[in-house]
Design a protein with these regions (language model features):
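Conserved short beta-strand elements that form part of the metal-binding/catalytic scaffold
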Residues: 34-73, 123-134
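Short, conserved charged micro-motifs
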Residues: 21, 90-94
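Electropositive, surface-exposed helix/loop patches at the edges of structured domains
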Residues: 67-84, 94-101
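Structural motif
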Residues: 55-58, 79-81, 118
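Core segments of cupin and vicinal oxygen chelate
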Residues: 6, 14-57, 98, 114
Length: 134
């Protein structure tokens, strides 16, 4: 059976240490808080925030205090990176560099992927997440 019902990434979930740091970080990348809700987990309460930029949705969730220590000890969270398409990699690189983002590479990197190759760079988020721009 061929699975043909997957259309696109719906959202990317990132466990965060502190909403007060994470929300402004994603706002600086052009994301908007489109939903915020508390949730109950294991006798405590956490917070979930959906951040949206065009068709890209990032779910930031802060677990209750009891689970927060384990999340803070993670090096890269549950996902090691997620990628965002940009129109012009060089423009995005310079704009984010000028804005003071923590860019991992010194310049966009070329990989011989796909038919014509791809260029990308990565930004480190406040919770150890890596955001690839290509």
């Amino acid at each position: 059976m061929k699975i043909n019902f997957i259309h696109k990434i719906q959202h990317i979930g990132i466990p965060v240490h502190c909403m007060e740091v994470s929300i402004p970080f994603y706002e600086r990348l052009g994301f908007e808080n489109v939903m915020e809700s508390p949730f109950e987990f294991d006798g405590g309460f956490g917070t979930c925030v959906m951040m949206k930029n065009h068709e890209v949705i990032v779910e930031l969730y802060q677990m209750p205090e009891k689970q927060l220590a384990e999340i803070k000890e993670r090096k890269v969270g549950h996902i090691d990176h997620f990628a965002i398409d940009v129109e012009d990699v060089d423009y995005a690189f310079e704009a984010l560099k000028k804005a003071g983002f923590d860019i991992i590479e010194k310049e966009p990197t070329f990989l011989a992927f796909w038919k014509n190759g791809t260029r990308f760079f990565n930004v480190k988020g406040p919770n150890g997440e890596i955001i690839e721009f290509n």
